[in-house]
A protein has these predicted regions:
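Bacterial signal peptide processing site
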Residues: 22-24
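C-terminal motif of bacterial Sec signal peptides marking the signal peptidase cleavage site
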Residues: 17-20
């Protein structure tokens, strides 16, 4: 009987430990529920349009799927862009999206280009980023086609 109680107690503690370790500093759904992705989209477009550095930008679209807590980022650039610059466009989009999320939710961590840390929003969502020329008709034509699992520091590379 004593062994059975100890076993049940041990299993309970292990289950609680696993559950506690799986939580981030904030519940993902609680963070993203506070965000207005339409405002983030508008401000991202404005940031690209007003930037002299990213003048070959054509459009950017973000789509958030709350069921999977997924964020899709699609940046369309003019066909004349040097493909090697598309990594800069991707990082600019990510840093701007995180900055706009920080304006809406207190406590999200900053983006850091030096160590491929994409910021607090990207700790809580799985992201997928595509940078492609406007003439792209299939995946083979994309410059960047990269997934960024939540909390990872995966480097963005050319496709």
């Amino acid at each position: 009987m004593k062994k059975r109680i100890v076993t049940i107690f041990s299993v309970g503690i292990i289950a609680l430990s696993i559950t506690a370790c799986g939580k981030s500093s904030g519940d993902s759904s609680e963070i993203t529920k506070k965000l207005d992705f339409d405002i983030i989209q508008e401000n991202l477009d404005t940031a690209f349009k007003n930037s002299e550095t990213y003048s070959i930008y054509n459009s950017c679209d973000i789509e958030y799927d709350s069921d999977g807590n997924d964020l899709n980022i699609i940046v369309a650039v003019n066909d004349s862009i040097d493909p090697s610059l598309s990594v800069d466009y991707a990082k600019y989009a990510i840093s701007t999206i995180n900055y706009e999320a920080q304006r809406q939710v207190e406590g999200l961590k900053d983006y850091s280009n030096s160590d491929n840390y994409y910021g607090g929003l990207f700790d809580d969502v799985d992201a997928f980023i595509t940078v492609a020329p406007v003439s792209a008709s299939n995946e083979d034509d994309y410059f960047i086609f990269e997934s960024i699992p939540r909390g990872s520091n995966r480097e963005i590379k050319l496709h």
